[in-house]
C-alpha cells in the first residue's frame, strides 16, 4: 500500500511539474512576442518592416501561410517599396502552382513575373539569381518563363 501511495505522489509531482512550464518555453522558436493580429495592424498602419518579417516567420507555422501573407506582401511592396515584399508577392502567387505550373493563368503569371523583376531591380538576391539564371524578362510569355523557373 505504501508503494502505491509513493508511486501516486511521484506521478502527481511529475504532472504538476510538467504543467508549470511557462508559455515562453512551449512556444515555437519562430513565435514573436506580438500576436499575428498586432503584426498585421502594424503593417497596415505604418509599414513596419520588422512587423512584416515577424509576420512572414509566424505564418511559416500555417499550412496556407504563403497565401495569407500575400495581401500584406502587396501592401509592403506597393505602398512601402520593400524589396523582400516584392519577392514574397511573386512567391505567394506561384506557390499554389509550384508542383505543376501549367494551370496558372496568363494574368497571374504576368503579375508574378513583374513582381519578381521588381524585386530583382530592388536588389533582392534570390530574385536576382532567378532572373539572371533563367533569363527572365518582361513582355515575354510569362507562363513559359515560370515553367523554366520551376523545372
Place the predicted regions along the sequence by residue.
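C-terminal motif of bacterial Sec signal peptides marking the signal peptidase cleavage site
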Residues: 15-18
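Short helix-capping/linker turns of helical repeat alpha-solenoids
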Residues: 42-55, 79-84, 89, 96, ...
Amino acid at each position: 500500500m505504501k508503494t502505491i501511495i509513493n508511486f501516486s505522489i511521484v506521478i502527481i509531482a511529475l504532472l504538476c511539474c510538467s504543467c508549470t512550464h511557462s508559455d515562453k518555453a512551449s512556444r515555437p522558436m519562430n513565435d514573436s512576442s506580438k500576436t499575428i493580429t498586432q503584426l498585421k495592424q502594424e503593417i497596415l498602419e505604418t509599414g513596419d518592416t520588422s512587423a512584416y518579417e515577424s509576420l512572414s516567420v509566424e505564418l511559416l507555422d500555417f499550412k496556407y501561410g504563403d497565401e495569407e501573407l500575400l495581401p500584406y506582401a502587396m501592401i509592403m511592396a506597393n505602398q512601402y517599396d520593400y524589396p523582400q515584399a516584392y519577392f514574397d508577392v511573386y512567391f505567394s502567387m506561384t506557390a499554389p502552382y509550384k508542383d505543376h505550373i501549367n494551370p496558372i493563368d496568363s494574368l497571374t503569371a504576368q503579375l508574378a513575373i513583374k513582381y519578381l523583376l521588381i524585386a530583382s531591380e530592388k536588389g533582392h538576391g534570390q530574385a536576382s539569381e532567378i532572373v539572371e539564371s533563367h533569363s527572365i524578362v518582361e513582355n515575354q510569355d510569362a507562363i513559359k518563363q515560370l515553367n523554366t523557373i520551376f523545372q
